[in-house]
Every structure is written in C-alpha cells, then in structure tokens.
C-alpha cells in the first residue's frame, strides 16, 4: 500500500531539519494518513480509503 492520499493525492515532502548551528540534514515530512470508511453515493455503499487528515476535515465541512 502506497503512502499517498487516495482522495487528494498528497505524498511525503522532502525538507531539512536545521540545527541551532544551521547544519542541515535531510528529513522526510510524511503525510498524516488515516484509514476511513467513506460513503459512496455512486456505488451506494461504504468504501474503505486511506486519506489524509486534511481531506477528512474538508469532507466533514462539506457534510
């Protein structure tokens, strides 16, 4: 299973962890993914999805 949001397509972001002395080490900022059941009106059933918390937030705002 890939570490990608099935709704928005979000993936991990490459960045740097910067110390006090400004030494930079590479860091992977992962997406906060959650397993969630979402109602699909087209299929008339619950669908299990792996979606980001940002997508969950927008889904609850639209309902």
UniProtKB/Swiss-Prot annotation:
GO terms for cellular component: chloroplast; ribonucleoprotein complex; ribosome. Its main location: plastid. The keyword Transferase does not apply. One of its GO terms (biological process) is translation. Keywords: Chloroplast, Plastid, Ribonucleoprotein, Ribosomal protein. It is found in: Plastid, Chloroplast. InterPro entries: Bacterial_rp_bL28, Ribosomal_bL28, Ribosomal_bL28/bL31-like_sf, Ribosomal_bL28_bact-type, Ribosomal_bL28_sf. GO terms for molecular function: structural constituent of ribosome. Gene3D superfamilies: Ribosomal protein L28/L24 (2.30.170.40). Belongs to the bacterial ribosomal protein bL28 family. This is Large ribosomal subunit protein bL28c. It comes from Pyropia yezoensis. The gene is rpl28.
